[in-house]
């Protein structure tokens, strides 16, 4: 079996639209949560979100290309371009039939859909864009990446809600591991901060209503947490077989060594209260990596800042790691990023790869009064320098989808 490594990364996020800015802000504990100013929030319970700043699609992609794409595909292409450039791969020197794309989105082009529904209702069918369907479909981002890079290998857009990023990375890892591809773009993207989705999540009482202090709203594991903060962006990684990477003397961020997935089989939106599915995904990932729980040095938690979710993930970690759970730093990137939905797993995998490379665990901010049922070491407030060899990253989604990946420091 082939070993699989990460040779390029690209990010679009509320705390930075390149790896350097993103990482520096993450380890400084900078929050990307702001007041929503893209639509009227007067009648909404939640008025805050993690919004990507200073992103000019026309400048990044060109006006013609940007105009026909929904924002979620724009984010994906921008992140993919960064990752490709970072990897130093040369299309003329690789087999494009073994170049794949595994990139998904949880919601797809909802903004474009709503714009066209409004146009249809107000002005009739002639005002509906002929590019509506290819713009809104969840596989649009993967398709656009495939087209741009002439990637003729395996292509897929997994749809596992907020577990998408890890699902995409894990399935791409499997393909390369078993020799069916040399290089794959893998990750997730999302742009769904519109009035309809904020209203829906808000009415489901899933969102934080801490509108008076946005940067304090996302507070995983804190007793005063009151829901997640919706966010947006994209995280794309270049996965490559080690043999392929070594032949071209590529820079390597980290090695992907394990992947596990499971289903809660419990409820369409609520996580299993005892974290059973989360436990199974983590256990499967460690088994797949052929490592013991004692070998894990850091955990990147899903940790969305919901009452039940944070407790159930803590329970799952303690069930799998036993007493060792109290010795492992557990970081919650969503305390700064908010919940990027389908983009979360890809972005958090990038953060974990950087942690392995730099030996720094990002902090969990806003953890001022820990929930008594959340009693692990969550790296509160300040980043920590730690010797890290192996890291585990969790992503869980509506429908009970769970995916965990294991990364290892490459030496």
Language-model features: locations:
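ACP-dependent fatty acid/polyketide chain-elongation machinery
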Residues: 1-65, 243-255, 350-364, 408-411
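Glycine-/small-residue-rich "gating" segment that lines the acyl/pantetheine channel
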Residues: 123-129, 167-170, 174, 191-247, ...
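Acyl-CoA/ACP chain-elongation machinery
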Residues: 180-226, 259-273, 303-310, 327-377
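A glycine- and small-aliphatic-rich helix-loop capping segment at beta-alpha/alpha-beta transitions
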Residues: 20-27, 111-125, 175-178, 198-211, ...
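Conserved small-residue
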Residues: 8, 26, 80, 101, ...
